[in-house]
């Protein structure tokens, strides 16, 4: 097929205990999301964590980068959809997404204690100032658990909105090596007289080297939050940090709430801005064929610090490009490579079978279609019915051909 529909155990110990609290929810096009309860010693409470695994995670052996996200309940669905859309279009790597839900949001996401008082002289946010402890929870409990019980690559992204954006900036300047990239959406840098903004300005002025990507954004938000964002963007424009990539984007047609969806889209595009394999501008064909595509992903491996395999769907596209240009033999070799690299995928067998069938070699196509339907059933592949129909059609055709020869 030319396209493919895509859709743990946790660390048990003194510090952390994960317990599955509800069934996994599989949604077409957005992988599988599990809702887990976490008992944290650092925070002294139980937290709910949502973990989204990519389509095919249960049936392959691939490892994935991880996007950690605050406000997990609010943003998991649209973020998973954004990731799936970008992955299908070859723009980013597929990701495991870990969304942490809230108990005391202000406590966890604010670096500084609040001194603001109400008319009665009482603190408006008496629990504020726990961001360092929340970051410790990420570093010592959450991330080790995820990395033990899920197949992850050594690449971490942190995304947060509003106070979560403030937390992302605080994390970057407090522990710049803890995450590889940051997405800070409408960061509340006006918090407590711009305390975190001032530290960020000093950090950006004095830091010498940091292999990190930062994407920051804001909607049409006047007042202190907008002014603080502009100050951050100004500080970013003056920095000379080696290996540091950044983008600060205003979206004047969005507000404080609606800006998140597009920010996650553009933030991931910034982090993975060179991800897409180069194509010929005239024909749209992948430049350099399979060798050129493999060379591109080798460069990405060097940039991201882990082995980045050429994606199955991209190799599949290359095969169909060749098939469409009448280069059947070359297409078959590409499809064979996909079978070698992704033997657990039903679709790779189906595609190779189709190439053989188009060339009139139904005797070679039939067992491959059979393999595709067997794997499709085993993997609960949404395209199983198509694989089965292809096998039955070619099997019947082969029997008819054999019967004719006997006459």
Label each region the model flagged.
Residues 7, 11-12, 49:
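Extended hydrophobic/Leu-rich segments
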Residues 11-22:
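Bacterial N-terminal signal peptides
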Residues 27-359, 368-404:
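Non-catalytic cap/lid and distal C-terminal segments of serine-dependent acyl enzymes
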Residues 1-7:
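N-terminal secretory signal peptides that target proteins for export/translocation
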Residues 4, 20-21, 29, 39:
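Intrinsically disordered, low-complexity segments enriched in Ser/Pro/Gly/Ala and basic residues
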Residues 22-26, 407:
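Polybasic, low-complexity, intrinsically disordered segments
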């Amino acid at each position: 097929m030319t396209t493919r529909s895509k859709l743990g155990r946790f660390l048990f110990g003194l510090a952390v205990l994960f317990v599955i609290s509800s069934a996994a929810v599989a949604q077409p096009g957005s992988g599988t999301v599990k809702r887990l309860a976490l008992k944290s010693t650092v925070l002294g409470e139980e937290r709910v964590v949502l973990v989204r695994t990519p389509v095919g995670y249960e049936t392959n052996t691939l490892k994935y980068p991880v996007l950690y996200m605050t406000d997990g309940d609010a943003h998991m669905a649209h973020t998973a959809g954004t990731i799936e859309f970008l992955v299908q279009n070859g723009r980013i790597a597929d990701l495991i997404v870990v969304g942490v839900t809230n108990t005391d949001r202000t406590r966890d996401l604010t670096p500084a204690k609040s001194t603001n008082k109400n008319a009665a002289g009482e603190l408006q946010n008496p629990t504020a100032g726990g961001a360092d402890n929340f970051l410790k929870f990420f570093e010592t409990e959450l991330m080790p658990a995820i990395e033990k019980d899920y197949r992850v690559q050594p690449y971490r992204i942190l995304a947060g909105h509003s106070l979560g954006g403030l937390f992302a900036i605080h994390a970057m300047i407090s522990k710049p090596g803890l995450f590889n990239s940051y997405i800070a959406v409408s960061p509340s840098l006006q918090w407590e007289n711009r305390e975190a903004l001032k530290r960020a300005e000093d950090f950006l002025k004095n830091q010498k080297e940091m292999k990190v990507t930062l994407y920051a954004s804001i909607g049409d938000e006047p007042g202190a939050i907008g002014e603080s964002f502009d100050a951050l963007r100004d500080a970013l424009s003056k920095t000379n940090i080696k290996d540091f990539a950044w983008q600060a984007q205003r979206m004047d047609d969005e507000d404080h709430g609606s800006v998140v969806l597009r920010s996650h889209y553009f933030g991931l595009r910034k982090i993975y801005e060179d991800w897409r394999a180069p194509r010929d501008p005239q024909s749209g064909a992948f430049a350099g064929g399979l060798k050129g595509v493999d060379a591109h992903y080798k460069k990405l491996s060097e940039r991201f610090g882990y082995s980045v395999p050429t994606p199955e769907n991209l190799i599949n596209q290359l095969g169909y490009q060749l098939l469409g240009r009448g280069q059947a033999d070359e297409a078959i070799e590409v499809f064979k490579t996909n079978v070698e690299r992704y033997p657990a995928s039903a679709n790779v067998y189906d595609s190779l079978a189709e190439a053989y069938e188009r060339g009139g070699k139904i005797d070679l196509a039939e067992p491959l279609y059979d393999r595709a339907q067997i794997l499709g059933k085993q993997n609960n592949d949404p395209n199983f019915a198509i694989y089965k129909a292809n096998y039955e059609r070619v099997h019947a055709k082969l029997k008819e051909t054999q019967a004719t020869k006997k006459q």
